[in-house]
Amino acid sequence: MQVILLERVAKLGQMGDVVDVKSGYARNFLLPQSKALVASDANIAQFEAQKAQLEARNLETKQEAEALAVKLDGQQFVVIRSASDAGALYGSVTPRDAAEAATEAGFSVDKKQIALIAPIKDLGLHTVAVRLHPEVEVSINLNIARSPEEAELQASGKSIQELAAEEEAAAEFEIAELFDDLGGAASDDDDQAPASDETA
């Protein structure tokens, strides 16, 4: 099916391009979201008549997106989730969670604008792309943690695995010291034990 693009569509074309797409993609995505018109003679004439208006609207939305991009780019948002000791999440962090975290911080971001390749399934810092406009994309950082305190530690540069290793090393050190103390006490007891009379 041939359609006329009313705005830039990633991997498809620029505004005004007449492109061939699968009919399902046109009917289910491009046409309902007003991203394209069916390429008939009447629609081509209508597009040409409205082209200046569409370009002005596109420029306005792009400028709004660029203004938001300046504020949003590089921001870090904390998402609190339950996770195992190894750092694997019980569930996952989805585009909806990322959009909600950004919205709570005062940014207007929709879940459709979040570009996750795959759901996030482990604790730590994750970089996520946000497409504010077909021509404006920024990156945000999601700090996935079990608690606000853990999020602060991660933000300072420590990973959950490093923290767990430090805690484990400290516990092993305490156990080793305890055994050393017990071992020293046992050898003191051996030294103080009365010598048995071997001549009897």
Curated annotation (Swiss-Prot):
Which InterPro entries does its entry note?
Answer: Ribosomal_bL9, Ribosomal_bL9/RNase_H1_N, Ribosomal_bL9_bac/chp, Ribosomal_bL9_C, Ribosomal_bL9_C_sf, Ribosomal_bL9_N, Ribosomal_bL9_N_sf
Pfam families to which the protein is assigned, alphabetical? Ribosomal_L9_C, Ribosomal_L9_N
Gene Ontology BP term (one): translation
The keyword RNA-binding belongs to this UniProt entry's keyword annotation: yes
Which Gene Ontology cellular component annotation is one that this UniProt entry carries?
Answer: ribosome
Q: Which SUPFAM superfamilies match?
A: L9 N-domain-like, Ribosomal protein L9 C-domain
GO MF, one term, reads: rRNA binding
Keyword list (alphabetical) reads:
Ribonucleoprotein, Ribosomal protein, RNA-binding, rRNA-binding
Q: Which PANTHER family does the annotation name? A: 50S RIBOSOMAL PROTEIN L9 (PTHR21368)
What this protein is reported to do is described as: Binds to the 23S rRNA.
Q: In which family does this protein belong, per the annotation? A: Belongs to the bacterial ribosomal protein bL9 family.
Q: What protein name applies here?
A: Large ribosomal subunit protein bL9
Species, as recorded: Ruegeria pomeroyi (strain ATCC 700808 / DSM 15171 / DSS-3)
